[in-house]
Amino acid sequence: EILRCLVGSEMCIRDSLSREYQKGINTYANLEKYATVTQDSVKAAQEIGDTADSENTEEAVEEVSEGPQIAVDLDIDYDALTKINEDFVGWIYYAPLELSYPIVRGIDNDYYTHYTFENVRNSSGAIFMDFLNKPDFSHFNTIIYGHNMRNGTMFGSLKKLLNDPSIIKEDPYIYIFTKEKVMMYEICAAYITNDSSHTYDLTQTAEEQADYVKYIRNVATYYWDDPMLEESLTEDTRLITLSTCHGLHSNNRTVIHGVLVASKNR
């Protein structure tokens, strides 16, 4: 009889967790209508090629040759999203992992580990910026957190980049959209660390920033070196750091770094 009760209780817990997971999935599925892809990479590449073949191509060719070009655009209803949550600061998009979520910035780094974008308590939480970062992504390193959900939602898919770096090589560009601009970051490093490592240092001085990128190179499992980050470091260098838990009840974290390679005003 006791065993039957224990089994019944376990089934109830699993059912409750399953319902909560589904609520989280539904919440973010409903938000997708506020951010739709308007231009994919193939179409953008075709447009760049067409421009290069036109009569007035010299300036266009120079622009393309300077580096990677922004090739994805999202039609985002910023006003509607801000009305839902005043902490809304932008949208993150990475096509290979079907990662597409609003980003919030709270008054601490705890609240949005428990509450969704719609401020409903749920284990999915939200994708959120470190509260010490500037909401316009202007810090040298902007840290963005999300839960490692078992169903692969939120930042649960980031571990795929560690397990299969070919995903990065095929498409290394993470996009951040704000009301003011579009920013494209090239994934430059991936690794596992702990929650008290130098990864989470918010650097201030040029010396600290140089030390930080050297640290990344030393600890990274995957490292982009064309060109090497420390060799291309300038006062205009901007990074994003995506962080999620690695393993259940663990202090370890899966970390993905991206370096800003292109941006444009909206």
Placement of each model-derived feature along the sequence:
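Single conserved hydrophobic/aromatic residue that forms the stacking wall/gate
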Residues: 1-8, 12
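Solvent-exposed, non-transmembrane regions of membrane-associated and secreted proteins
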Residues: 10, 14-266
